[in-house]
Amino acid sequence: MTLLETTSIAAVSLYGLLSSSYRSVQVLHAFRTLKSETAENTVEESSLPSVDIIVPSFNESPARPVRLPGIPCQPRSYPGMLRVYVADDGSRNRDAVVAEQLAYAGDARFEFIMLPRNVGKRKAQIAAISRSSGDLILNVDSDTTLASDVVSKLSQKMRDPAVGAVMGQLVASNQSDSWLTR
């Protein structure tokens, strides 16, 4: 065997060993996470933190209003107190926000904040956060669809005093539309 062949075999073998070790660590970590999530699911409802969801919006199309799918079904998986603040950032055409306002008019968990002029996404978020009173705040874009159990999972992670912030996994809804989003 030549030096090149020996080196190639050693490199491929080392790569295989490192890859399988890495995968093993991932599997062990996943099992540990699953066990801790199962234990966390037995939390008393009274000890759950209140969660405020902040949704800034600007110039949403009336044909595609502010998307709140997933938010109304959060209480089924998260029995704690939940409130939603939708902050319209001075849109020129407020038809989309008004349509959402009417759709959730009977639900006390929803509050719509209409800013008089466009001040930017961050200031719209700040306007909503200043009205919120929850123990935890979840910032969501107006075009985001939430999984039905996201509030429950994120609040469970925040129970650890060593954790200062958590983030869910983001998946683009248009991920297969073009080479850029793939």
Curated annotation (Swiss-Prot):
One of the entry's Gene Ontology molecular-function terms is:
hyaluronan synthase activity
Q: What keywords tag this UniProt record? A: Cell membrane, Glycosyltransferase, Membrane, Nodulation, Plasmid, Transferase
Cross-referenced InterPro entries = Glyco_trans_2-like, Nucleotide-diphossugar_trans
Enzyme class (EC, first level)? transferase
Keyword Membrane in the entry? The reply is: yes
Compartments reported by the entry: Cell membrane
Q: Which family does it belong to?
A: Belongs to the NodC/HAS family.
List the PANTHER family: HYALURONAN SYNTHASE, MANNURONAN SYNTHASE
Q: What does this protein do?
A: Involved in the synthesis of Nod factor, a sulfated N-acyl-beta-1,4-tetrasaccharide of N-acetylglucosamine which initiates a series of events in the host plant species leading eventually to nodulation.
Q: What is this protein called?
A: N-acetylglucosaminyltransferase
Per the UniProt record, the source organism is: Rhizobium leguminosarum bv. trifolii
